[in-house]
Amino acid sequence: MGDKQNQPFQLSFNASLKIDFQGSRVTSDGGLILVRELDERLGFGDLIRQHLTDPRRGKNTQLPLADLLRQSVYGRLAGYEDVNDAERLSQDPTFRLIGSAKIWERGAALTSRLQSFETEMLAEEQNFAGLTRINRELIAKVEAIDSPRRVVLDMDSTEIPVYGQQEQSAYNGHFESTCYHPLLVFNREGDCLAGKLRPGNVHSADGWEEVLLPEIEWQQKQGKQVVFRADAAFAKPEIYEALEERGVKYAIRLPANDCLERDIAELLTRPVGRPSHKPVVRYKGFLYQAESWKKARRVVAKVEFHAGELFPRVGFIVTSLDTDSRAVVRFYNKRGTAEQWIKEGKQAVKMTRLSCHRFRANEVRL
């Protein structure tokens, strides 16, 4: 065992080289410094001070809220999704650099402090609402740089498995697991504009109004033309009516039924002759009114015949778009990109790490 080395060891053969034995001065997360620069240019710190309220008093305020929120967010960006990771990251050079002067001097927050911040301070109603406003305003700052006049909103739900008997977790027959079932809204650029954590056993469209309608109102106040896409879980007349009242165009997958298939009977006849190696695709647009609808709406059908398959693949889309049928289908199919954004959230920033017992604490983490 050698003596403890507190100072860098200088090599005799080359004075420009030094060996440092202090692990606290080594980091593998230097890329976060560039994220911190983006954070500064977008005014993230100002938004935190504007929208979050600090309930602490006295010595408990030694670490500013901005430092705590940055540590929480940056930890996830670097792959440290567990609050327990804060213990070893508190002296990491990168996590000390991204904070205020106090963090550089003292080190970042330890696990107990960061856990209290996430599950108690941010869970307060005012701060929880503030997190939503911070997210919305950050995206607005980016949109202001290169903002198209038309915004496409994609809504979808997903499964987040739970870790035990957590509040409001429940078995979902569709996913065949005990889970939470959040609802999310994305734009074409992959920004998650709005979200809501929900119990595991609710319908995919449950609570759509409180997630979607405020986002539509926000976008229209910015002078944007809003277009909406969603899968068949959102094929509900109340959704069509709400969108039409607000002048929002939409393309929503419609579940097949006998009435719809009778309207396209001529498309379902297999082409005569030897089957083509390439799919044979047919389109048709027509007016259709279900019993639960107050009026008829345009429906676009797509029928595909594939080599080696006995029956055609049939899909229906209810839409208020005025483009031709092929363009409607092509536009709707881009909705699948939203599923990739969800995968990115699960795999890249670990949004599935909702391991707190309390439902509100998990809402904060999401």
Language-model features, listed with the residues they occupy:
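Dynamic "connector" segments at or just before major functional cores
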Residues: 1-201, 206-221, 243-246
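Hydrophobic "anchor" residues on beta-strands that sit immediately upstream
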Residues: 152, 225-227, 249
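Alpha-helical scaffolding segments of alpha/beta enzyme cores, especially the outer helices
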Residues: 210, 214, 238-241, 245, ...
